[in-house]
Amino acid sequence: MQVKSIPYGINFKYKIWGVCFMVNKKLVAAGVVMSIFAGSLVGCGGSSEEGNGGNSTQIYFLNFKPEIADVYKSVAKDYEKETGVKVKVETAASGDYEQTLKSEMAKSEAPTIFQINGPVGYNNWKNYCLDLKDTDLYSHLSDKSLAVTDGDGVYGIPYAVEGYGIIYNQEIMDKYIALSNKKTDITSVDDINNFDVLKEVVEDMQANKDKLGIDGVFASTSMASGNRWRWDTHLANLPFYYEFKDESQDDASIIETGLASDTVEFEYNDNYKNIFDLYLDNSCTEKGLLGNKSVDDSMSEFALGKCAMVQNGNWAWSQIKDVNGNVVKQDDIKFLPIYTGVDGEENQGICIGTENYFAVNSKASEEEQQASIDFINWLFTSDTGKAYVVGDLGFIAPFDTFNEDERPSDPLSGQVMEWMEKDNIKNVNWIFQSFPSEKFKETFNDALLEYVQGTQDWSYVVKTVKDAWKSEKAQ
């Protein structure tokens, strides 16, 4: 099983979808032939009917991303208009996808399309993952090695490349750079290329927050239950990326090193602490209140201009633009790498990869499986579907069905693509798919919360993380 960074496909192909009709042949009386005939025409759109009841097979998609839940519902409506096939879209609460999936899979009408987060996710759900190697969508995947595979089978197809880092508001940064009394000598955000410079700038901005019109440099470090994934997953990716990189022969084997590691040293824990403390100490919210703060709170603070920076990914654009009273201009939203003080980080980029893999339920009926495959294929090959992908969904899709003009229009996805194309920059691979379990992340989070609240010191966090990795790997 292998996961790599995903290139953006530029070749263009368009698949024309045919329309087929089925006629109910059970006629009750000659006098009602025409009315029954008219009422029994059903556009199949690649799916089939269940028995003779005239009800089209329904697709059930369990969505992972709350921030685009409404978009997927619009997608479902348009798909039904074009094909006559209904798509039920349900969305798990933030941080609760795995538990929600377990609950939904136990029901008689289980999801027909769900998401796995890479090799570990596949290992948990391998008995429910259909082999997709013969599907059209897999044939359009730009690099076949990007899929989650097991033997000759393909069980997870990546559908989006994403990136995260420190999102900043260029307008506020320009105000800081123009300050006559600033203690740093930066003349551009480009001068911030390591942790030492970042720390110096952030602390000086915090000291000048009133002049800058902000409550703090960073948005709230959200520590409410279900809202800590930015710290146990995304921020934690960096220290473990560097630890596994030190033990790997090349970049391609970093995630395999993590998957094979029964123990970790958490060697770069001080680097994690560097940036985490910087977030906490220069926030628009006091530490004692962070236990009740959500990701939505953080994004609202940024959108309303209460802070200059927030750690998040390109998916956050929808959260920013939809905030009532948003004051951040689209052209002012940019990415900085998450610098932590690692040697040579001047050439480090943002974190780019994917944890987004579509899987189709192997326990569903053949009709439901085919209908689900057809829907996913439509999303990435039809004009309507692709318009959603590069528009409201904002995906950087890894398929050859998109040409150079079909790129996401939102600023953060555009930033990800710019970082992918920078010379002499090494973006950080996503390797958190190698983390042993959701319980490991929860344990990590609980220790972080105690650290934030001042009831435990940092050494407790380090020990907890190392012990949790070992115990979860032993399961």
Question: Which residues fall in each region the model found?
Answer:
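A local structural motif
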Residues: T57-Q58, E82-T91, E109, N181-D190, ...
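Short helix-initiation/N-cap motifs at beta->coil->alpha
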Residues: T91-T100, N193-V197, L289-L304
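Glycine-centered hinge/linker elements that transmit conformational signals in sensory
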Residues: E200-E203, D246-N292
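C-terminal capping/gating helix-and-loop segments adjacent to ligand/active sites or protein-protein/ligand interfaces
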Residues: I352, G394-F402, G414-K470
